[in-house]
Amino acid sequence: MKPEKPKNLGFKQIYFNLDKILFLFFLTFMMIEFVWLPSNSWIAGLLLRQTGYLFLSYNNIFAIITGSPFISLALFVLVIVNLLVAYFQIGLLFIGARHLLCHEKRTLLEYSRKVFRQSFLFMKQVTLAKITFIFFYVMMLFPVIRKILKIYYLNKIVIPDFIVDYVEDKYWLVGIVVTILALLLFYISVRFMFALSQLLFEKKTVKEAVRYSLEKTRKHSWFYTWNLLWIVVKTYLFFILLLIPILASQALMDGLTHKESLVLGIINFVLIKNFHYIALTYFLIKFVSFLTGEELEITPRRKKDHWMRWGVMGCACIFFALEGYVYLEAPVANKPLIISHRGVSNKNGVQNTVQSLEKTAQLSPDFVETDVQETKDGQFVMMHDANIKNLTGVNANPQDLTLKELTKLDISENGYHSKVSSFDDYLNKANELHQKLLIEIKTSRKDSPDMMKRFMEKYGTVLKQNGHQMQSLDYHVIDQVLAYDSQIPVYFILPYNSIFPRTKATGYTMEYSTLDENFVNKLWNTDQKLYVWTINSSESFDKSVHLGADGMITDDLEMIQEQVTIAQEDPEYTDLLFKQAMEFFNF
C-alpha cells in the first residue's frame, strides 16, 4: 500500500484551535512549574536532611547510599515519580493533539475533560516496557520532541558542557562518531515512529507496536525519513518567517527614543512568545496527524467560542508582556564579577603560572581563578590536573613530588612554555599586582590529614587582607575555611544541579549548562552568591545574566567584558529579542 503524505495544516486551522492547545500548554506548564516542582524540591530537600548531609554531589552519593539506605530508596522512588510526571506530560500533550484531530464540536471545557480523562487512563496502562520505549524514543531517537515540547525532567538529563568541551578538545574523532550515531538514531526513529502512536493511542504492547511500525515503514524508509525531516524543517521555517518582520520593525524602532523602543520591544516579545507556541502547535499537530493519518478540520464554532479563544490568548499575552518587560528592561540588574579561568584569557599563556598571571592581570579581571594542590613535602603548588603528564610530560601526581622537584619541571600549553609555579610565588605576585584571586583547593587521597589546617594558618591572614576568595569541590575544605575565619569568602563547587544544597558556604560555583531558575529562585531566599563556569559564548553569557549570576568564570575575559558593557550601557532590544527567539532552536 502506498504511504500517505502528511496532511495539510494551515494557519486558519491552527487559529481556530489555538485556545485549546494554548490552554493545554499553559495548564501543563502551571502544574509542573508551580505545583510539582516546588513540591518535588521540598520533598527532596526533606529526605536529604534526614541523611545528615547538606548537599548531594558525586563525592558523597556513595556515603549517602551506604549510610542511609532507606532514605536513599525514598530518593530513588522520587526519581521514578519524576520520570512518571514526564511520562504523563508527554502523554497529555500527544493525547491533546490527537483530540484536536477528532472531528467533533467541543467546548474548551469538554475538550479539557476528555484529554485529562484519557491521559489518566494512559497512566493506568503504564508498563516498564512502554515507559522505557517512549523515553528512549523521545530522548535518544528523536530528541526534537523533548526539546520543542520542553519536557522539563527529560531536558534536565544533560551532559554538562564542560565534559562535552573536554571530550571534543581531546578526542576530535568523537565529533565524527557522534554525527554518524545521530544519523543512525534518526533513521531508527523513522522506522519506530509509528510505534509511538500505537502505544499512545491504540493500547498496543511494545512488541506489537514495534512490529507494526517496522512493517509500515518497510520499503518506504526514505519516504518517511524525508517527510519526518520536512515536518521539523517546516516548523522552523514557519517560525522564522513570522520572526523576520518582528526583528526588522524592532531594528528600525531602536533608533528612536528609549520609551518607544521599549514599548514596541514588549509588543514584539509577546508576538514572539505567541508565535513560539503556534510553531509548537504546528509541529505537534502535524506530527500526530502524520502518525495517525487524521486531518485537522475547521469545525463550526459558536460565537462565545471566539470570546473564549481571545480570553485565553489575552491572559497569555498579559503574562508574556510582564515577562517581556523584565527581560528587556533589566538585562543586567547588577554587574557580575568577571573571573579569569585558571589565570589565562583567550589562550594567552600557560594556565596557573606567574607569567600568565602578569599578562591576564593587565585585562583587569575582578578575580583570577587558580588551582592549588599539596605536594609530597607538604607545600603548595599551582596545578589543576590530578596527573601532570598532559602539561609536563611527567606521569605523576603533584602529591608524588616535592615542591622543589615540581618547580623544576617545564610546563607547556597554548604554544607557551614556562616552569611550574609555587603557590607562594603566585600569591606574592598577585598581591604585588593588586590582583584578587579565587583560589580553588583541589584535594586527593594522598593529601596530609592536616593540609587545610596548615594552609589556613600560613595563608589565611594574607588572603583576608588582600580580598582573595576560596572555593573547592570538597566540602571539608569549606568547613575548615569557615572554622578558621568565617569572613573569608569560600564557595562550594557543584558540577551538577540536583537537590538544592543547604550549606554554610558563601555561595556556589555552578556549571552553567545544568543551572535553572528553580535553583536561582531558592538561592534568592538566602544571602548566598552564585558563580557560574565556564562562560565562553554569548549564549552561555545570556543564560547566566538572566539567571542573575553574581560572577562568571571565563576563558575569554575581553569577550565577556564587552558583553557586560553592551548589556549594561547600550542594550539593543533587537539583539535581546533575537536571543529570546533563538531559544526555539536551542539543542
Model-derived regions, located:
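Loop/turn elements at helix/coil->beta-strand transitions in domains of secreted/extracellular proteins
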Residues: W222-F223, S364, E432-K436, Q465-G467, ...
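Membrane-interface segments at or immediately adjacent to transmembrane helices
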Residues: Y327-M382, K389-L391, N395-D400, E405, ...
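Active-site-proximal loop/turn and secondary-structure-junction residues that shape catalytic pockets
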Residues: V344, E374, N387, T443-R445, ...
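C-terminal active-site rim and adjoining tail of enzyme catalytic domains
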Residues: F492-F587
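Metal-dependent phosphodiesterase/phospholipase catalytic core, i.e.
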Residues: H384-Q487, Q580-N586
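Hydrophobic alpha-helical membrane segments
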Residues: M1-I338
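Conserved, mostly hydrophobic/aromatic
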Residues: H341, T360, D371, L406, ...
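Hydrophobic faces of well-ordered beta-strands that scaffold small-molecule active sites
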Residues: I338-H341, V368-T370, L437-I441, H468-Q471, ...
